[in-house]
């Protein structure tokens, strides 16, 4: 069922209360003008993240000498447009706040075309939003009777998949908002789902019942089931969708072969539960987020060396809330992002392993992050019931 909504993200330049993820993590304000210097028309380095004409005091005295580009000491026409970091996206403002959820937001994804996005969480609702303009919440998808733990669009964006604590996975028509299929078979919470990138529309799921299941949405029951013993918190396919990769509370990442119907190999290294998995766009590398406070990159190509962990990233944290903190790749693979319980948005450079951004703004755990498919925009979903979209360089 689809319901028209009137909720809006606050428009205009301001991001709402609290700073959102800004476009740069640099140092604080620079030094002010020298004593006695008249406030000139050129803005200093200590500018707000969001350029706003309203922030300029109306009683600015004219610059000494009344010169400059405009008469009477006024700044030249268009000077206010320069009053902040240069814009690098088509967002209405460098930071947009999306509020409308009534509970913790666990997951968020951009549509593959980049014009809309979906979010979901504890309130059992899936909200669809416009990325540009006022970021209107234009539709609500209702149908789950439990919290929605993970969302994924299929490759062409025609379908949206949602995994829920109501033990089901729903398949939605992303155009009409209708639920076209409900996949039943798990006996406990479904923590994760992931659709195949190509070929017949398959989807894999992982559950607290300790199983990993493969579904063909043209059929009613699961096509294959793998028994993992321990709760499964995250799943994904490999690039060719002939293997399912799973992570859970046994700390291991397991690769299941669909043709041979067996466990192919196990990747060990994490010292606590694996809460998020993400395959790189070209399919060679796997990203994992775990409760041992590390994010790791693994080589999942066939015939890779036995030690498949190639990089370890640190900075983000998990805590007693035990949220399923996810992770994601930028489209070109140059950056990764990981959820964190310390309320910051973490973005790392994959080559240098350096933290590029540690962005404040959220008042609760940051559960999932998503990179825009075409523009330098990052989306964050948090337990504070909000989402932020922010420009990054």
Label each residue range with its predicted role.
Residues 94, 104, 113, 137, ...:
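WD40/WD-repeat beta-propeller blade-loop signature
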Residues 370-393:
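Blade-level signature of beta-propeller repeat domains, shared across WD40, Kelch, NHL, RCC1
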Residues 98-105, 141-148, 184-190, 226-232, ...:
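WD40/WD-repeat beta-propeller blade N-cap
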Residues 1-101:
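Intrinsically disordered terminal extensions that flank WD40 beta-propeller domains
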Residues 126-130, 169-173, 193, 212-216, ...:
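WD40-repeat beta-propellers
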Residues 108-114, 151-157, 163, 194-200, ...:
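Loop/turn segments within WD40 beta-propeller blades
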Residues 119-123, 162-166, 205-209, 240, ...:
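Conserved strand-to-loop turn within each blade of WD40 beta-propeller repeats
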Residues 102, 125-127, 145, 159, ...:
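A conserved positional marker within WD40/Gbeta-like beta-propeller blades
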